[in-house]
Amino acid sequence: MIQKNWQELIKPNKVEFSSSGRTKATLVAEPLERGFGLTLGNALRRVLLSSLRGAAVTAVQIDGVLHEFSSIPGVREDVTDIVLNIKEIAIKMDGDDAKRMVVRKQGPGVVTAGDIQTVGDIEILNPHHVICTLDEGAEIRMEFTVNNGKGYVPADRNRAEDAPIGLIPVDSLYSPVKKVSYKVENTREGQVLDYDKLTMTIETDGSVSGEDAVAFAARILQDQLSVFVNFDEPQREAEEEAVTELAFNPALLKKVDELELSVRSANCLKNDNIVYIGDLIQKTEAEMLRTPNFGRKSLNEIKEVLASMGLHLGMEVPAWPPENIEDLAKRYEDQY
């Protein structure tokens, strides 16, 4: 069946986020099919860095300054350095319309992003960021234009044709995600040792959490990839009927070699042709102890494992074993 191409691929049953402050987060997702750690990690990283929207300064006007190659009396930095510092201001802004912010300060002292006067829907996320340093008697006034956008926009594209003299365009780095790294390691699921474990570290400017940034990036990928799906979802009526008619606990379809028993116990079950938990729980303690090389220690180990699943030896299972046991085991593997 067509749907087996995607339905039978393993999906992560563990997706965990841990945060370190407002700007850093770590994602761990496992298990993934072999190769999917690299595929998903690289795709998410590229989208995180390039496609999420954020706010940035697009232009600045400084009183008494005509162009960025000027210097300002009493200001230690030249205008070029001031513009570079302005590019690093982290901003969160609602809405799509351009907004303006103003800063005015007298020396001596340091002008920081926290000195900027903002309107209600603009938040400065790094208020301690230094813009420039004023000497005694110096004064500066700057007016910033702020926009929302995505990706990187160079200053020449922020230069309006009707811009007034003295309006200096600024390179805009809109992305709220500043750094993304990932690594892929092997992980275990049952007796399979070569599934992928994806670990991603995301650093943002604080306008969005790392967890939300990953969610937005995944949604972008989902939307972009959907155009390539040229068929309707196959009907699963027969499978759904089989699901509702199952006469026993789906956990009985799990194979005993996934119980992580000791080697001795596992070999004894294998030699006795006990494949599924449904086979095992129908055995009595006396029957198990008659198995070659199977002792009281192995019996107690198995009883403890079964008890953790709400099962025990000597149970009766109706309609066991089902004729299509292998197909049922695959169908229900996500439920146990």
UniProtKB/Swiss-Prot annotation:
Region Alpha C-terminal domain (alpha-CTD): start-end pairs: 248-336
CDD domains reported for this sequence: RNAP_alpha_NTD
Top-level taxon of origin: Bacteria
Enzyme class: transferase
InterPro entries documented for this protein: DNA-dir_RNA_pol_insert (IPR011262), DNA-dir_RNA_pol_RpoA/D/Rpb3 (IPR011263), DNA-dir_RpoA (IPR011773), RBP11-like (IPR036603), RNAP_asu_C (IPR011260), RNApol_insert_sf (IPR036643)
A single Gene Ontology CC term: DNA-directed RNA polymerase complex
GO MF annotations, alphabetized: DNA binding; DNA-directed RNA polymerase activity; protein dimerization activity
GO terms under biological process: DNA-templated transcription
UniProt catalytic activity: RNA(n) + a ribonucleoside 5'-triphosphate = RNA(n+1) + diphosphate
Function per UniProt: DNA-dependent RNA polymerase catalyzes the transcription of DNA into RNA using the four ribonucleoside triphosphates as substrates.
Oligomer and partners: Homodimer. The RNAP catalytic core consists of 2 alpha, 1 beta, 1 beta' and 1 omega subunit. When a sigma factor is associated with the core the holoenzyme is formed, which can initiate transcription.
Full protein name: DNA-directed RNA polymerase subunit alpha
Designated gene of the protein: rpoA
